């Protein structure tokens, strides 16, 4: 599919689509001649007063195939996806861009064509396109089909490890390599691993994997979440992130926000004021510039 999509939307669906986009974290605005426009880091969805809907951006295919068509338009013209049934390990993470909460890395080992076919039938896709309410049930399905491994680094542990690695990509490479080594058969044989290329050089992850699992083939690509097994891993990572956020909220009796927006910064200031720096450090990633900005404002 090209990086744009045009269709017609019934006025009765305008509010439904807007509500779903808001739940997914899209930023909503109302440019001239539109009903509304929703934007995420990878896709924009514009609904015009005429009913025309235009989707643009590098995330267009996933957005249309896994959300817009099946859930809003109730059509399925894009779902004839060629299925890759090769046994493989998919790895993905959640939380690296969130000021509050842990870094969660998950791996899924789909060891048979039957398991992979079942993942396709479950409509697995990138977790960023799935409402949080659906994540839990999808994660349960994935665990029933495949071998899985999740590493959750709560802020206290994450901050200590980051101080050691001094680089987020190096820390990510370590968690990814640990997951792959844990799930991979030894010898790996025909099984390979696939991951998003999160560093500018493929060597960062490759070297980490080679230290632990010398014989497995590693494939790195941008937008690896388009692979169904990597997408399954992204769902498990997201599930771990959401459950960990809830655990931190319960432990410290605070409300945490996702992302790293101005609202997140304001919430951090409130936590610093009400709970103190010790608690703030236990619920956030202290290498974010937001942390020092919040501390600075607290000392004024």
Swiss-Prot record:
The keyword Magnesium applies. GO terms for molecular function: magnesium ion binding; RNA binding; RNA-DNA hybrid ribonuclease activity. It is found in: Cytoplasm. A divalent metal cation binds at residues 92-93, 196. Keywords: Cytoplasm, Endonuclease, Hydrolase, Magnesium, Metal-binding, Nuclease. Its EC number is 3.1.26.4. The keyword Metal-binding applies. It catalyses: Endonucleolytic cleavage to 5'-phosphomonoester. InterPro entries: RNase_HII/HIII (IPR001352), RNase_HII/HIII_dom (IPR024567), RNase_HIII (IPR004641), RNase_HIII_N (IPR024568), RNaseH-like_sf (IPR012337), RNaseH_sf (IPR036397), TBP_dom_sf (IPR012295). Its cofactor is Mn(2+); Mg(2+). Residues 86-300 form the RNase H type-2 domain. PANTHER family: RIBONUCLEASE (PTHR10954:SF23), RIBONUCLEASE H2 SUBUNIT A (PTHR10954). This is Ribonuclease HIII. It comes from Chlamydia trachomatis serovar D (strain ATCC VR-885 / DSM 19411 / UW-3/Cx).
């Amino acid at each position: 599919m090209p990086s744009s999509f045009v269709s017609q939307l019934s006025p009765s669906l305008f509010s439904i689509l807007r509500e779903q986009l808001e739940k997914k974290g899209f930023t909503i605005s109302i440019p001239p001649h539109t009903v509304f426009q929703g934007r995420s880091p990878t896709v924009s969805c514009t609904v015009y007063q005429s009913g025309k809907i235009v989707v643009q951006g590098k995330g267009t295919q996933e957005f249309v195939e896994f959300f817009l068509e099946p859930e809003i338009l109730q059509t399925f013209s894009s779902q004839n996806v060629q299925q890759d049934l090769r046994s493989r390990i998919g790895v993905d993470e959640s939380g690296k861009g969130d000021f509050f909460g842990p870094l969660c890395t998950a791996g899924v080992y789909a060891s048979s064509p039957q398991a992979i076919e079942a993942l396709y039938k479950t409509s697995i896709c990138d977790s960023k396109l799935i409402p949080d309410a659906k994540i839990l049930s999808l994660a349960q399905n994935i665990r029933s089909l495949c071998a899985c491994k999740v590493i959750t680094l709560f802020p206290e542990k994450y901050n200590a490890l980051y101080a050691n690695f001094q680089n987020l990509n190096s820390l990510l490479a370590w968690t990814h390599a640990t997951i792959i080594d844990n799930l991979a058969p030894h010898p790996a044989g025909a099984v390979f691993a696939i991951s998003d290329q999160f560093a500018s050089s493929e060597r960062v992850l490759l070297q980490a994997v080679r230290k632990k699992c010398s014989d497995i083939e590693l494939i790195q690509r941008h937008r690896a979440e388009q692979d169904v097994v990597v997408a399954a891993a992204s769902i498990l990572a997201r599930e771990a992130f959401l459950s960990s956020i809830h655990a931190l909220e319960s432990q410290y009796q605070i409300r945490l926000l996702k992302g790293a927006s101005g609202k997140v910064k304001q919430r951090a200031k409130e936590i610093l004021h009400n709970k103190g720096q010790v608690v703030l450090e236990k619920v956030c990633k202290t290498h974010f510039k937001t942390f020092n900005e919040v501390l600075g404002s607290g000392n004024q």
